[in-house]
Amino acid sequence: MGAGRGTVLVAGSVAVLLAAVVASLAVGAHQLSPAEVAASLWTEITGTGSTYADDVVASRIPRTVLGLMAGAALAVAGVVMQGLTRNPLADPGILGINAGAAAAVVTGMAFFGAGATGANVWIALPGALVTVLLVYGLASGRRGSTPVRLVLAGTVVTAVLMSYIQAIALTRPDVFNLYRFWAVGSLSGRTMEQAWDILPFFLVGLAASLAAGRFLNALALGEEAAASLGVRPGTAKIAGALAATLLCASATAAVGPIGFVGLAVPHMVRSFTGPDNRWLLVLSAVTGPALLLFADVAGRLLARPGEVLTGVITALLGAPLLILAVRRMRAVA
């Protein structure tokens, strides 16, 4: 894809993202106009005065910020996972990242008094990292890990961890009551403290992932071809997996295991960019937050004055896209 077309796509995606941000700040039990949102943001920045609209916007800022971060993290992690496994149906959970984070959170709830939010960031991240290392250890052989081995190892580890989660949740009603709200995934009830907690991991993972576009393009040609181009396949795969783990684990820790964003966004963007992972990563980083914020807004509109959890909306949006992707792959084959 040419630079001119890419620039136009990025500009259009940024415009859509800005619209999603305004909608996220304006829509809810109390509706605000874009002008009220702008005035309230200015008041929030300058610290001058306070009105009811200002308080409403201030209460929606944390969920909007976390929507931006989680959407970008999940979408970019999805691109990296699809590139590493050379599987267009892969998502960030294919290496057991979501299951590892969830198992760690359930353990914290059951044995260390963790709640549904807050300190889960520091519990979920180690759980996800340990799970990825375990998956790579199981998938590695004399010739290193292959995409098929990674997928199989990730599937096995995920199944074991989900069995552990179900065993704890079914035998501990108190844990189940906490876990069921976190497990669906939602942006509601979040605070800026959680955004600050995941910010370092998010920035490191995002920077490393955006820099991996060239390596992912090389790996798409096969490991031997990638090696002939000066890329070390083993090192590239480990670095990419760690970057995706930081992104997915930080997002999962903050907002829960929201599904389908990491699968749906790369597919939507790829239809415009083609297979070039460099543009795919950049555009996914912008489109992912827009999709997640619009899903959150839709959840607020569908059940006012209450709301439908964001994870439910993304599943409703992502499932048809997954079916279309599978049918498209069969048609191409």
Please give the residue ranges for each predicted region.
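Alpha-helical transmembrane segments in inner-membrane proteins
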Residues: 1-333
